[in-house]
Curated annotation (Swiss-Prot):
It is found in: Cytoplasm. It comes from Bacillus thuringiensis subsp. konkukian (strain 97-27). Disulfide bonds: none annotated. GO terms for cellular component: cytoplasm. This is Phosphoribosyl-ATP pyrophosphatase. It is an enzyme of class 3 (hydrolase). The keyword Iron does not apply. NCBIfam families: histidine_hisI.
Amino acid sequence: MRNAFTLLFETIEERKNNPLPESYTNYLFSKGEDKILKKIGEECSEVIIASKNNDNEELVKEMVDVLYHCFVLLAEKNIPLKDIMEEVTERNGKLSRVGDRREIDTL
């Protein structure tokens, strides 16, 4: 049985491969990577605000928007969802120490 994430990603890929004129997903693909990245940034800001405001209902909605736009980016970059799922599986259960994390050198 496919889960909701798989179904969403399949729908996004279907829109990419078989565009529908009124599709928001196709609009994002037609505008390109910069637009997709801008939307991810906007949605992340909305997640922060919803969390800060302790609005869990809005937080859930905004998290779904972030995931959707990230999935669009994956499709744009031709990265299959299975690659993400494999990485999650690989990391699952592994202890991560703060000192083992890479520092952010540039912003």
